[in-house]
Amino acid sequence: MKYPTRLSDAVHILAFIALYPDCDLTSNKLAESVQTNPAYVRQLMSALRKGELLISVKGHPRPALAREPEKITLLDVYRAVEG
């Protein structure tokens, strides 16, 4: 049985951004880390932006967390990507 991976992939993306705040993180680079395609990463990042967990600007490869990592809960991420 295949399980949805949106939540774990979103957590992976947020953690990667938190660990490398000063690096250029394109959707291609994030997709390589998550082992998926860039379009899927962009969809997740859009959901995370709408959920006010991520700040990013199209064409600017340095996304940032909208809050301190300690203040982002799994429930916040779940609501953003599955809500």
Named regions from a protein language model:
Residues 28-35:
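A short alpha-helical element within helix-turn-helix/winged-helix DNA-binding domains
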Residues 1-13:
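Short alpha-helical segments that sit at the start of domains
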Residues 51-66:
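Beta-hairpin "wing" of winged helix-turn-helix
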Residues 32, 49-50:
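Alpha-helical residues within the helix-turn-helix
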Residues 18-22, 67-68:
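Short helix-capping/hinge SLiMs at alpha-helix to coil transitions
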Residues 69-83:
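Conserved segment of winged-helix/HTH DNA-binding domains
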